[in-house]
Amino acid sequence: DLGKNHLFPGVLVENGGYAAIRSGVKGTFHNVAAAPIDDYSISCIMGAAVKNEGSRFSIDGGIELIFTDSRLQGVFGYGVHPESHTGGSGNTVSRAAGKEHAIRIALENTSFFCIAGAAAGGTVNGNIDISADNASKGKNNWGDFYRTGITGIGSGDNLYLPIGAVTVNGDINLSLFDDSCNTVYGGYFFTNTGDAGFVNGNISITIRDSGSR
């Protein structure tokens, strides 16, 4: 039970700092429970996050977050710390040698509010792969929790973040099986920081046996 904490399996960079990870960020979670969204329990779970303008990070080896049998609010490969509301354009996440994905998020039998591969300004060198299998079925009785959204590039709308757009040098792949969610975006860009967002690759969305709209 994570209570009212935020979870950063990889790195949190703040106060104008810089962090570099050379072997990637990987987290596997089972039976992680968050309180109802009305309690503002977990604003987000991120492989990496920036907290102040000017902070940035570089991750070689990619980010991978896997959840089973859990109840979550937001899951981001990388993004913006919810207390800061500022992003940065110097973030770079690159895939490991021999792998196609730079960011992978997989949910199984897990309820959520929002999933995003990347939700802050920066560059992703490699594919963004997001998959949800039996996500949000039979677990959502918390009102807004059921209003779920999946996006390859994060809107972050549940956090109301003024975030920069993301450039993806690769493909975005979204796969939903036996799920129930309201909104699915291949790419959803906020450009209010003045940056444009690009996907230099393909966007693929697969939905099967899902109550999505």
Model-predicted regions and their roles:
Residues D1-R213:
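Surface-exposed loop/turn motifs in large extracellular/passenger domains
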